[in-house]
Amino acid sequence: NQLASSLIKSGYEIKGKRFFDTICFKASGWKEKSEAMNFNFRDFGDGLVGISLDETTTESDIENILDVFNAKLNLDHSKSIPDNLVRGSRFLSNSVFTKHRSETEMLRYMHKLELKDLSLNTSMIPLGSCTMKLNATTEMKPVTWPEFSNVHPFAPTNQVGGYHTLINELGDRLVQLTGFDAISMQPNSGAQGEYAGLMTIRAFHKANNQQERDICLIPSSAHGTNPASAIMAGMKVVVVECDDQGNIDEVDFEKKATEHRDNLSAIMITYPSTHGVFEPSIKQLCEIAHDNGGQVYMDGANLNALVGLCEPGQFGVDVMHINLHKTFCIPHGGGGPGMGPIVCKDHLSKFLPSHTSISSPNENSIPAVSAAPFGSSSIL
């Protein structure tokens, strides 16, 4: 609020009467000076500038920000939170916050909690393939380097050349490893990758004047995120039966693909499957889908089992997500931020997600699926 009151006193008009950590106001001639002082403010493009502060902002920072706009610090400022929103009840009232009064007591309490934890030093973590691994210290340490961790996801392109080189080189390698033609680093997780891939398929059908294609065939053995992603992408799920060994029932698959050939949008297949089964008929399944007008989405959650042996792009798959925090062992830490980029064949590449902070050469791109243009880029 001190920044806002100082700007108001200097003649600026703040948009809105109530705010939390961000203010917007009209200003001009500030960009070069702000960059020279190592500040990046949001330029809305119509003379409106946005500034966000957090708990690390100091009074010295505020003075320097004000200097960019030739404004002076106002020491007489009021609170921006209205009285009816100020908390009046007690907080941290549980006894746990007051019973450990010495360093020794706190140490023993924390150790007691530690002993309750199920971790890799006592057992295997039974929570899925992304948590059943141990990141080496050499993989975790770079995440703490300020050159990676202190870069804002919307930083101007000319200030993050190293990041773009890293992202582009990694993307090229992933495309080559998987046998596809293009990649989007935007999805933050495998589930988000599923959604992005299916939305890309929907955009492809729409561009071909086949927006009526909204049926998605999914095996009964699929991970729960598959049907959820299909529903979120606006598709209708048709379940395909599996046999006792976990294999897709080819007869049932072909029957349902043929039955819905006029509005088949996609099939989703996990390879190897959630049961650990390598479908021997993967190529035939892809051919059946294509013969009936559908596209093939492959869930790459278990890609680790085959990436060193073959390229999914050669199976007939059109788009696939990669769990980098699984297959390629990027830092994840048993539940931290993940990365689920999608790779696709050339005919789908122009529909990959766009983002407002970067220019996209494709006018047919689907909207952003993540808040940041390159997802959780600090762990790449």
Q: What are the functions of these language-model segments?
A:
Residues 6, 102, 148-188, 193:
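Conserved N-terminal alpha-helix of the aminotransferase class I/II PLP-enzyme fold
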Residues 52, 56-57, 118-139, 186-197, ...:
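Conserved phosphate/anionic-ligand binding catalytic regions in large, soluble enzymes, centered on
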